[in-house]
Amino acid sequence: MMRPVVVKEKQLNESQIHAVEDEVRQAKTMDRDIVTHAMKQSVAKLNPKVMIKNPIMFVVEIGFIITFILSFLPSSSSSIPGWFNITVSLILLFTVLFANFAEALAEGRGKAQADSLKQSKKDVFANVVKENGDIVQVSATDLRKGDVVIVKQGEMIPSDGEVIKGLASVDESAITGESAPVIKEAGGDFCSVTGGTMVVSDEITIVITSNPGESFIDKMISLVEGAARQKTPNEIALNTVLTSLTLIFLIVVVTLPIFTNYLGFQIDTAVLVALLVCLIPTTIGGLLSAIGIAGMDRVTKFNVLAMSGKAVEAAGDINTIILDKTGTITFGNRMAHTLLPVGNETIEQVGKWAAISSVLDETPEGRSVIEYVQGKSISYNRELAEQGEFVPFKAETRMSGVDLQDGTKVRKGAVGSVIEWVQSQGGTIPKDVNQKADFISKEGGTPLVVAVNNRIYGLIYLKDTVKPGMRERFEQLRQMGIKTVMCTGDNPLTAATIAKEAGVDEFVAECKPEDKIAVIKAEQDKGKLVAMTGDGTNDAPALAQADVGLAMNSGTTAAKEAANMIDLDSNPTKIIEVVGIGKQLLMTRGALTTFSIANDIAKYFAIIPAMFTLAIPQMEALNIMKLTSPLSAILSALIFNAVIIPLLIPLAMKGIAYKPMSSNALLSRNLLIYGLGGVIVPFIGIKVIDIIVGLFI
């Protein structure tokens, strides 16, 4: 009996292993394809119309053209051999190619993601319901906003829409990567559906909310391909500074021959070009675009869709995060924790009526009450409740329960609402009701009062558990100087307890959607950048007001349109990771800029003595690296300048190691590693290259 089971299990494991091996092979093939495409693109990007978008590398390309032409002309200097110009031109060519490769590689990863998304955009037909009730099959490309479509089991949802009738399980793995289907139903905050996803059970009727080319997948494809990518304000500012430096050094180099002629010697044009390339910040100039593209790519890999690079950068500068309590800080499933009788009632009586009020209640809270009562072996008449008329919870009444056939009315609900209901029927309120309700609230729980007609029997203690690790995560944010504010509809006592347990800095109790906007504006008035999460239509104004608004993919269309980021996994806690990615992007750009500028110090000590030693022997004192010869020094500096770009591509793509710490500590750390390192590494690198070059010249 056991042997077939063992064989079957072994075969299953082998198939799983083969599946994993296939995935690995496909990933390697994709990586090879991306690299091959990037190599081709690095050559295509040599087009001056493309290169001029990056002024720094455009100057290097002009230098390549000049030295390449000079290599075919007679040398004006007897000290410069004929092969020198062509060697310099080749090094400059590879410098530009390496920079182009970095950008093309970053773009290639986005295009690979776009290709996989395009697979979900197949030729789909939709069953459109006409005004007269007839159902007509049309192509998805012919659908327009406002069309009503029926989607059955096994059919693909043709375009973005909202469910107006029915309930169904929808497979969203084409977008989210999550294989587990999600429930979509009419009404509420989970009615939004996305084109390209598939209905795996039941049937729904949807109203189309986007025209062709405007769907969610269309936007994703456009964004990850980079077609909609615009340079961020910080990127533009840095690019302006780097371009200004390049212009200053260009003026210096162009005017240098005037002074050298005055001193009685001439500098070869190729040497001047080499000096210019070594002076300008080519390292960061070659990696700047790749850093920005890779930053958005990292967000996308986290299953978060950023509508612009500006949103990712803003996440890195966030000062305050507004967080909902339910589902973000806590699990959101309030479960029955204990029963508290009041007056002279017993726990058995409370349990009996609590269970009867919950038999027809399909909410998680109602189910948890039944489970708790059964776990305590408290008896109750289930049939009695099933024969009664269920009274659902309403926002106006804040109660639910059941009206039994004999006229008995059983209710459970918010303390104030049930007390008011009992008093309206002439009942009296036990003295310890409010006392025990306050106790539950102070413990961080939610009190529900159980009453029958005009008599209160006791309270149900519902407890919502704080997610593990939240206190540590908020402490990390605090170390980064980020304030956390919890917004909750709970009463102040419950809110204060949860806030203390979770470790948030501030909380807003009994919070309404409009209160969130007030909190955001108050923080922004202090000059702070604010991030928040949301999924409902009522969250849309606050998401639009926030500097970083992260909407849940499971939420409404209004919320997703108002936000500048969308979490495909619908996990509100991911806002913390998004902030980390934003900070990593800014840190990577800053660190590599520091490294690039620090590099110039070593290049000065390599190339300047080489240029002036023959005319000014005293300049030999600056040759602290003891380089072999002037020509070797110039070539070594140029080679290092070129090689450092591809060596830093992995760092630009992956981002520098990120640890939560204060801004001052972060600045000191980066200056030590990338500032001091940017000075030391070129000294070592240029010297090693000089030794190798010295063997050939």
Swiss-Prot record:
It comes from the Bacteria. Disulfide bonds: none annotated. The keyword Translocase applies. The active site is at D324. Its EC number is 7.2.2.6. Pfam families: E1-E2_ATPase (PF00122), Hydrolase (PF00702). One of its GO terms (biological process) is potassium ion transmembrane transport. It is a multi-pass membrane protein. Keywords: ATP-binding, Cell membrane, Ion transport, Magnesium, Membrane, Metal-binding, Nucleotide-binding, Phosphoprotein, Potassium, Potassium transport, Translocase, Transmembrane, Transmembrane helix, Transport. GO terms for molecular function: ATP binding; ATP hydrolysis activity; magnesium ion binding; P-type potassium transmembrane transporter activity. Mg(2+) binds at D535, D539. PROSITE patterns: ATPASE_E1_E2. GO terms for cellular component: plasma membrane; potassium ion-transporting ATPase complex; potassium:proton antiporter complex. It is found in: Cell membrane. The chain crosses the membrane at residues 55-75, 79-99, 245-265, 271-291, 605-625, 633-653, 677-697. Belongs to the cation transport ATPase (P-type) (TC 3.A.3) family. Type IA subfamily. The system is composed of three essential subunits: KdpA, KdpB and KdpC. Part of the high-affinity ATP-driven potassium transport (or Kdp) system, which catalyzes the hydrolysis of ATP coupled with the electrogenic transport of potassium into the cytoplasm. This subunit is responsible for energy coupling to the transport system and for the release of the potassium ions to the cytoplasm. This is Potassium-transporting ATPase ATP-binding subunit.
